[in-house]
């Protein structure tokens, strides 16, 4: 049997990086794929531009931070808008990012600086750039503020520190998203014994149990009460149910020598006093 003539072999050494195949350089097919080089040079250029832009952005917001700190140092909080104070706080919480957009987004979402600090954790985390750690730190600031205000009425005659009572209650309750019923228990000198939340309900109602309130007052040897609850709607005007509930508590407490000094309703931008409205 005649042997087939040997075909000339192509040098396909591993160093070439290619293998012969159908439609390749070796059978005269389209050569564009072979001569197309990886676009490494343009990519390198793009990366260099991006890095430069990032450095410029970093220099800009670091300079902005310095300027904002200087304004605060020289002029105090009056020199800054709400979003700028929040931005200044976020510098510490988010050290390597431009925090102005986050601060503005928080104010846009919740309306005021106080509302930002009073917002629930899950809602804070819905804002882009605010993770759990940042949200917790914002709530920590709110807690510190409330403790500071509460210290202004501790061990003092509450009726003689009325503006401090209102400031504390507003900080603690104005931005709650559900109704909350709080009681300040006072001794016979009207000094604060205890500050307790007795109930928390829905957006427009919270259950109140007059007998439980009186029982707790007796346990604490309290002889006077200040009732406080919030209206998440923002309007502190007393409802008919608020008036009737207050009367029931007064009627339950009075035979046991416990006085209800006032019932305060806290709204977002103000408060209503039953005593001031001559409802008690």
UniProtKB/Swiss-Prot annotation:
Annotated region described as Disordered, given as residue ranges: 1-22
Residues that, per the record, bind Zn(2+): 229, 231, 242
Biological processes per GO annotation: proteolysis
Record carries keyword ATP-binding: no
Domain MPN: from-to ranges: 158-280
UniProt keyword Lipid biosynthesis present: no
Keywords: Hydrolase, Metal-binding, Metalloprotease, Protease, Zinc
Protein name listed in UniProt: UPF0758 protein Atu1607
Taxonomic path: Bacteria, Pseudomonadati, Pseudomonadota, Alphaproteobacteria, Hyphomicrobiales
């Amino acid at each position: 049997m005649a042997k087939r003539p040997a075909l000339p072999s192509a040098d396909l050494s591993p160093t070439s990086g290619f293998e012969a195949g159908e439609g390749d350089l070796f059978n005269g097919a389209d050569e564009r794929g072979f001569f197309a080089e990886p676009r490494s040079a343009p990519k390198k250029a793009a990366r260099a531009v991006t890095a430069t832009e990032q450095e410029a952005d970093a220099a800009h917001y670091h300079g902005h931070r310095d300027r904002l700190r200087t304004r605060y140092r020289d002029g105090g909080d009056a020199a800054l808008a709400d979003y700028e104070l929040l931005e200044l706080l976020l510098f510490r919480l988010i050290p390597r990012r431009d925090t102005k957009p986050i601060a503005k987004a928080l104010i846009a979402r919740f309306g005021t600086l106080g509302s930002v600090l009073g917002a629930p954790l899950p809602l804070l985390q819905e804002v882009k750039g605010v993770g759990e750690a940042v949200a917790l730190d914002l709530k920590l600031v709110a807690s510190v503020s409330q403790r500071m205000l509460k210290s202004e009425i501790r061990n003092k005659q509450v009726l003689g520190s009325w503006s401090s009572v209102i400031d504390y209650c507003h900080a603690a309750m104005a931005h709650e998203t559900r109704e909350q019923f709080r009681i300040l228990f006072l001794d016979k000198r009207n000094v604060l014994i205890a500050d307790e939340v007795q109930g928390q309900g829905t957006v427009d109602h919270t259950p109140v149990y007059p007998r439980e309130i009186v029982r707790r007052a007796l346990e604490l040897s309290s002889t006077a009460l200040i009732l406080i609850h919030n209206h998440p709607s923002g309007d502190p005007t007393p409802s008919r149910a608020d008036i009737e509930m207050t009367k029931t508590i007064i009627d339950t407490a009075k035979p046991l020598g416990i006085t209800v000094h006032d019932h305060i309703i806290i709204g977002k931008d103000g408060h209503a006093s039953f005593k001031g409205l001559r409802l008690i």
